[in-house]
Amino acid sequence: MSDFDSNLDLAGTGASPAEAAELQRMLAVEQQKAQFTAQVHNFMDVCWDKCIDRPGNKLDSRTESCLVSCVDRFIDTTLSITNRFAQIVQKGAH
């Protein structure tokens, strides 16, 4: 969840409905960027702790393979959970 209110009240600001809608859209885009950045940091934290034994000048093949697999699993799991949640929400709407 974000600290931003996605239903920002712009009454009294002099913003036209079109300007308010554009501001809402821009806010949603920025929230998505922030969520993506947070997810990348989460991948980095989890996979770094799992795969990096000792930092060096470059990654060896085992470490690189571990990082790729870790991120792939993380993404697959996130997508699976997201898809399942969407199915539950969709079933609830019917």
UniProtKB/Swiss-Prot annotation:
Q: What is one Pfam family matched by this protein?
A: zf-Tim10_DDP
Q: How does it sit in the membrane?
A: Peripheral membrane protein
Which keywords, in A-to-Z order, does the entry hold? Chaperone, Disulfide bond, Membrane, Metal-binding, Mitochondrion, Mitochondrion inner membrane, Protein transport, Translocation, Transport, Zinc
Q: Which cysteines are joined by disulfide bonds?
A: 47-70, 51-66
Q: Which InterPro entries match?
A: Tim10-like (IPR004217), Tim10-like_dom_sf (IPR035427)
Q: What Gene Ontology cellular component terms go with this record?
A: mitochondrial inner membrane
Q: Cross-referenced SUPFAM superfamilies, in alphabetical order?
A: Tim10-like
Motif Twin CX3C motif: chain residues = 47-70
Chief localization class?
mitochondrion
Q: Which GO terms describe its biological process?
A: protein transport
Q: Which GO terms describe its molecular function?
A: metal ion binding
Tell me the domain of life.
Eukaryota
| Compartments reported by the entry | Mitochondrion inner membrane
* Family designation: Belongs to the small Tim family.
Describe the function of this protein: Mitochondrial intermembrane chaperone that participates in the import and insertion of some multi-pass transmembrane proteins into the mitochondrial inner membrane. Also required for the transfer of beta-barrel precursors from the TOM complex to the sorting and assembly machinery (SAM complex) of the outer membrane. Acts as a chaperone-like protein that protects the hydrophobic precursors from aggregation and guide them through the mitochondrial intermembrane space.
Q: How does it assemble?
A: Heterohexamer; composed of 3 copies of TIMM8A and 3 copies of TIMM13, named soluble 70 kDa complex. Associates with the TIM22 complex, whose core is composed of TIMM22.
- Domain comment quoted from the record: The twin CX3C motif contains 4 conserved Cys residues that form 2 disulfide bonds in the mitochondrial intermembrane space. However, during the transit of TIMM8A from cytoplasm into mitochondrion, the Cys residues probably coordinate zinc, thereby preventing folding and allowing its transfer across mitochondrial outer membrane.
For this entry, the protein name equals Mitochondrial import inner membrane translocase subunit Tim8 A
